[in-house]
From Swiss-Prot:
<keyword id="KW-0472">Membrane</keyword>
<comment type="similarity">
    <text>Belongs to the ATPase C chain family.</text>
</comment>
<dbReference type="GO" id="GO:0033177">
    <property type="term" value="C:proton-transporting two-sector ATPase complex, proton-transporting domain"/>
</dbReference>
<dbReference type="GO" id="GO:0015986">
    <property type="term" value="P:proton motive force-driven ATP synthesis"/>
</dbReference>
<keyword id="KW-0813">Transport</keyword>
<dbReference type="GO" id="GO:0046933">
    <property type="term" value="F:proton-transporting ATP synthase activity, rotational mechanism"/>
</dbReference>
<keyword id="KW-0997">Cell inner membrane</keyword>
<keyword id="KW-0812">Transmembrane</keyword>
<comment type="function">
    <text>Key component of the F(0) channel; it plays a direct role in translocation across the membrane. A homomeric c-ring of between 10-14 subunits forms the central stalk rotor element with the F(1) delta and epsilon subunits.</text>
</comment>
<feature type="transmembrane region" description="Helical">
    <location>
        <begin position="81"/>
        <end position="101"/>
    </location>
</feature>
<feature type="site" description="Reversibly protonated during proton transport">
    <location>
        <position position="89"/>
    </location>
</feature>
<protein>
    <recommendedName>
        <fullName>ATP synthase subunit c</fullName>
    </recommendedName>
</protein>
<dbReference type="InterPro" id="IPR002379">
    <property type="entry name" value="ATPase_proteolipid_c-like_dom"/>
</dbReference>
<dbReference type="GO" id="GO:0005886">
    <property type="term" value="C:plasma membrane"/>
</dbReference>
<feature type="transmembrane region" description="Helical">
    <location>
        <begin position="4"/>
        <end position="24"/>
    </location>
</feature>
<keyword id="KW-0375">Hydrogen ion transport</keyword>
<feature type="transmembrane region" description="Helical">
    <location>
        <begin position="37"/>
        <end position="57"/>
    </location>
</feature>
Length: 110
């Protein structure tokens, strides 16, 4: 079932992107720009998501250890934890917004 799902997703991506690829101009400057933008987006989003996930995991670990040592402060710890998660997630969202701006800002329009 998993192999079928992977093949289905690859086929779907190929079908959805084929028309854009075949209709694109072959200007090397445009190809280089969008190639670098895509590579940067993949690296940036991967680093942001990985770092955010690691930070959230460490935060959860600290909350659980603090609650186990002193159950009376669990409410305060959870409040601080939710605020921390929101700040971590906002960094990932900022990277996503930057990537979307990079993709949709067309420097080749005259």
């Amino acid at each position: 079932m998993r192999k079928f799902f992977v093949i289905l997703m690859v086929a779907l991506v190929v079908v959805l992107t084929a028309s854009a690829v075949f209709a694109a101009d072959s200007d090397p400057a445009k190809l280089n720009y969008y190639g670098y933008a895509t590579a940067g987006a993949l690296i940036g989003l991967g680093a942001a998501a990985g770092g955010g996930g690691a930070g959230m995991g460490q935060g959860l670990r600290g909350i659980l250890e603090g609650s186990a040592r002193n159950p009376g402060v669990t409410g305060k710890l959870m409040t601080l934890f939710i605020v921390g998660l929101a700040l971590i997630e906002s960094l990932v969202i900022y990277v996503l917004v930057f990537v979307l701006i990079t993709f949709y800002a067309n420097p080749f329009v005259k």
